[in-house]
């Protein structure tokens, strides 16, 4: 903002995520340099304004002694964006289960959130990456673990709980995009005080007195870690000679 620049996109990836993507793709973001956190900045507008903003931005980067790459073609831009797009696919190769949290914190608290993730990764010996929308403080924290490993699963749950408490301490919210649904119900009371909670329950009861609209969501505690993994198949994923899969019931 001090530069008078309003990027259309501002995406962040921490060092661990960058290392993960580079290992997955076999490509270096900054050739010849060790992995660093990455901030993807995209400008839009008319050609004149983009050129002016680009000059100001590059000067700020140089004055700050930061390494940067400038995309001078669509092909180069796609190469840089691949780092962001490959974040989730790269992490899926590390373990069979992912807890993907879309927490959001005030802009000036993002560094504290990232530092918290680094501490959790070390303390709990887990594969945890953080990336996301730096422009609005909505960062995705991905906990990778193997579901059948009870010790690792327990560590993932404890680390996630610590993350949610930290988000609350920083004045943030447990969901910036995906909503509460089922998986976040164990943490939702961290975000709302008793008065807010009772108000929401009263509104729910007024609009849905018989509890038929999206039953079990938000207000009923649901423990996702006690649930068995559910595998679904689609009709076009098996031949007509194969027996139809048994319906999934709950």
List the predicted regions and their residue ranges.
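Noncatalytic alpha-helical scaffold of FAD-dependent oxidoreductases
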Residues: 1-250
């Amino acid at each position: 903002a001090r530069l008078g620049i309003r990027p259309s996109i501002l995406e962040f990836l921490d060092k661990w995520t960058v290392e993960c993507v580079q290992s997955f793709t076999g490509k270096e973001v900054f050739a010849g340099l060790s992995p660093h956190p990455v901030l993807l900045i995209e400008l839009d507008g008319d050609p004149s304004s983009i050129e002016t903003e680009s000059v100001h931005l590059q000067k700020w980067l140089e004055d700050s002694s930061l390494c940067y790459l400038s995309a001078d073609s669509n092909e180069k831009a796609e190469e840089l964006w691949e780092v962001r797009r490959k974040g989730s696919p790269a992490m899926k190769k590390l373990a069979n289960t992912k807890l993907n949290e879309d927490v959001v914190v005030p802009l000036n608290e993002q560094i504290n959130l990232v530092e918290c993730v680094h501490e959790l990764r070390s303390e709990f010996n887990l594969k945890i990456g953080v990336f996301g929308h730096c422009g609005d403080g909505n960062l995705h924290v991905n906990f990778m673990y193997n579901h059948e490993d009870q010790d690792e699963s327990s560590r993932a749950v404890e680390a996630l709980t610590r993350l949610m408490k930290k988000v609350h301490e920083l004045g943030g919210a447990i969901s910036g995009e995906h909503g509460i649904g089922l998986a976040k119900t164990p943490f939702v009371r961290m975000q709302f005080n008793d008065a807010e909670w009772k108000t929401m329950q009263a509104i729910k009861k007024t609009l849905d007195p018989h509890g038929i609209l999206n039953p079990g969501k938000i207000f009923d505690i649901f423990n996702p870690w006690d649930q068995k993994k559910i595998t679904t198949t689609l009709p076009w994923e098996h031949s007509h000679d194969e027996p139809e899969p048994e319906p999934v019931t709950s």
